[in-house]
């Protein structure tokens, strides 16, 4: 679930 977090950054 790191892709979503990386999208926000």
UniProtKB/Swiss-Prot annotation:
The record's similarity note reads:
Belongs to the peroxidase family. Classical plant (class III) peroxidase subfamily.
> Can the keyword Transferase be found in this entry's annotation?
no
Q: Which cofactor does it need?
A: heme b; Ca(2+)
Protein's job: Removal of H(2)O(2), oxidation of toxic reductants, biosynthesis and degradation of lignin, suberization, auxin catabolism, response to environmental stresses such as wounding, pathogen attack and oxidative stress. These functions might be dependent on each isozyme/isoform in each plant tissue.
Enzyme Commission no = 1.11.1.7
Can you quote the record's cofactor note?
Answer: Binds 1 heme b (iron(II)-protoporphyrin IX) group per subunit. Binds 2 calcium ions per subunit.
A cellular component annotation (GO) from this entry: extracellular region
| Catalysed conversion reaction | 2 a phenolic donor + H2O2 = 2 a phenolic radical donor + 2 H2O
Tell me the organism. Answer: Cycas revoluta
Its annotated compartments are: Secreted; Secreted, Cell wall
Keyword vocabulary terms for this entry: Calcium, Cell wall, Heme, Hydrogen peroxide, Iron, Metal-binding, Oxidoreductase, Peroxidase, Secreted
Primary location recorded for the protein, binned into one broad class: secreted
BP-aspect Gene Ontology terms: hydrogen peroxide catabolic process
User: Would I find Translocase among this entry's keywords?
Assistant: no
Can you provide one Gene Ontology molecular function annotated for this UniProt record? metal ion binding
Q: What is the protein name stated in its UniProt record? A: Peroxidase 9
